[in-house]
């Protein structure tokens, strides 16, 4: 049972969002790029812009935001968010974790991430290299763009210390795709994890956000389908939620939806 709030009044509607494992999500991404010819850069830009849209919708008064970017695609989404935030009048501070600004593409960094990193630089957004002893200032909101679904194994000790440091802030935390330290398929903690106030996830709902520790650490969930065609969800079937999720999984869970037919966000409380 989903309730969507329109002008403060709940309306009962019937809407299902496909739930997927990470391996299935990767199949969807491959289809988007190879069959539907949506480039990796375009997907990164769509997701980063959607994340910024949700941030503004959810916390309209926030101005100073700190974005922690890893060197993978999740970091690229964070760089896109930073650019959008600046265009919308916010003051973004970008913290590069595990890498730094470079005029040539670093090894093991995807060209799309490097492109967005340089786009930030060209737009006058200062990129700071994170270190444990650096002053993080007083942000009004923190964006977790460190790993997303790209975390394999346990969180490294230096990242665990960063997560502990960020958790001490008393400001909202928005995670992009998946909170750092949460396994996107199992919902288990990979050694250490950052509890988010809200998580925005793309293309499909990840099972790990809804079960085990993931349903706690993800906070509210926002979902954007990145303009994916409906046919893609028939080509890669999601899991049957009834076979994997107990009846209490969605209880009091706030899930914000947006798809290609909507301009705004709708709130579902199951």
From Swiss-Prot:
Enzyme class: isomerase
Cross-referenced Gene3D superfamilies: YjeF N-terminal domain
UniProt key word DNA damage: no
UniProt keyword Nucleotidyltransferase, yes or no: no
Residues engaged in binding (6S)-NADPHX: 73-77, 148-154, 177
UniProt cofactor(s): K(+)
Keywords recorded for this protein, A-Z: Isomerase, Metal-binding, NAD, NADP, Nucleotide-binding, Potassium
Cofactor mode of binding and number, as noted: Binds 1 potassium ion per subunit.
Residues involved in K(+) binding: 74, 144, 180
NCBIfam families: yjeF_nterm
Known role: Catalyzes the epimerization of the S- and R-forms of NAD(P)HX, a damaged form of NAD(P)H that is a result of enzymatic or heat-dependent hydration. This is a prerequisite for the S-specific NAD(P)H-hydrate dehydratase to allow the repair of both epimers of NAD(P)HX.
Protein family per UniProt: Belongs to the NnrE/AIBP family.
Entries under HAMAP family matching the protein: NADHX_epimerase
Protein's UniProt name: NAD(P)H-hydrate epimerase
